[in-house]
Regions:
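Amphipathic terminal alpha-helices
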Residues: 156, 161-172
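Mid/C-terminal beta-alpha module of Rossmann-like enzyme folds, strongest
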Residues: 99, 103-146, 150
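Short-chain dehydrogenase/reductase
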Residues: 40-53, 86-94, 116-117
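Active-site "gating" loop of Rossmann-like NAD(P)-dependent oxidoreductase/epimerase domains
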Residues: 4, 25-45
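Substrate-positioning beta->alpha
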Residues: 70, 77-104
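Active-site Tyr-X1-5-Lys
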Residues: 15, 43-71
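SDR active-site strand-loop-helix element
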Residues: 20-26, 68-70
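NAD(P)-cofactor binding segment of oxidoreductase domains
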Residues: 1-21
Length: 172
């Protein structure tokens, strides 16, 4: 779906000259160092991430497109445990949707996410009942230890500021 389906959608958008916005993932980066910029080297960590990179490859060839490398989760967080040793740049889906409206006319690649933090710390802000879980080294699920994003490009476009609890200055 992420590769062939995206290639077909890209072709259709190009034929009709329609803007294409593709949601990719922060997992296309190696996931070891964190603070990944849009032009950093890519090395997907699992099959899902490889499929998203395949989709990106099709979209990238179309000039009227925007690739968003997104790090998001649902609110409320649906799991009872959260990793305390995995760093990421989570942002809630509803906040990503608000950002999308501000980026709709942009082109290229933009990282979308919140500040770098451990998953547990992010979730704990809204769910005090969440418990800690550690991901073991050499995990079989292909979870990177630090897939946090450099979001400076997004901040510059949005004139972002951190209010302390919500990381947006966006009104729709």
């Amino acid at each position: 779906m992420n590769i062939i389906g995206t290639a077909n959608i890209t072709k259709a958008c190009e034929e009709k000259n329609v803007k294409l916005i593709y949601f990719s993932t922060n997992y296309v980066y190696p996931g070891t160092a964190g603070n990944y910029k849009e032009n950093d080297s890519l090395l997907p960590v699992n099959n899902y991430a490889w499929s998203k990179l395949g989709g990106e490859s099709s979209v990238h060839l179309y000039k009227n497109s925007l690739i968003l490398r997104v790090c998001m989760t649902e609110k409320p967080f649906v799991h009872k445990e959260a990793f305390s040793n995995i760093k990421t740049s989570f942002m809630y889906q509803e906040d990503v949707a608000k950002i999308l409206f501000k980026l709709i006319n942009k082109k290229g690649i933009i990282n979308i996410g919140g500040p770098s933090m451990y998953i547990y710390d992010f979730v704990r802000k809204n769910n005090k009942l969440i418990t800690k879980k550690n991901l073991k080294k050499n995990n079989k699920i292909g979870m990177p230890v630090n897939s946090s994003l450099n979001i400076n490009k997004m901040k510059k476009i949005l004139r972002w500021y951190n209010t302390g609890t919500i990381y947006l200055n966006i009104k729709i």
